Amino acid sequence: MNATATQDRPIYWGTGRRKASIARVRLVPGSGKVVVNNRSGEDYFNRIPGYLAVLKSPLETLGLESEYDILVNAHGGGLTGQADAVKLGVARALCELDPDNRQPLKIEGYLTRDPRCKERKKYGLHKARKAPQFSKR
């Protein structure tokens, strides 16, 4: 088990990535609060409830949303990418907590890393696929 104990409270780690975002997640037994980069989850995600619902969804699948605090160090990308990275990190930490959690999380798709990233810009084009205007004559 990859859990670290602090004052008899085990800490479960998980790392999540999405687009350009990386989130290191710690699950600590607690009351269900979310702390992202030393700020409350509501404050960090600009009080947009959709982001908090996304990152708590693996806990809600297992019925553990009020039993663990989520402590996150996230960087890179934007809020959407970071929220999805935290979701993957929480799911991986829940697998560390109990290997039996893996099956329901896998069925819901929480353990699958989303491989879609920004496509690079090609020379001769304005963006990745946007070509200059074509003139027939």
UniProtKB/Swiss-Prot annotation:
GO cellular component: cytosolic small ribosomal subunit
Cross-referenced Gene3D superfamilies: 3.30.230.10
InterPro entries: Ribosomal_Su5_D2-typ_SF, Ribosomal_uS9, Ribosomal_uS9_bac/plastid, Ribosomal_uS9_CS, Ribsml_uS5_D2-typ_fold_subgr
SUPFAM superfamilies: Ribosomal protein S5 domain 2-like (SSF54211)
GO molecular function terms listed in the Swiss-Prot or TrEMBL record: RNA binding; structural constituent of ribosome
Pfam families tied to this protein: Ribosomal_S9
The UniProt record lists the keyword Nucleotide-binding: no
Gene Ontology biological process terms in this record: translation
Keywords of the record: Ribonucleoprotein, Ribosomal protein
Source species, domain of life: Bacteria
PANTHER family according to UniProt: RIBOSOMAL PROTEIN S9 (PTHR21569), SMALL RIBOSOMAL SUBUNIT PROTEIN US9M (PTHR21569:SF1)
Similarity comment text for this entry: Belongs to the universal ribosomal protein uS9 family.
Protein name: Small ribosomal subunit protein uS9
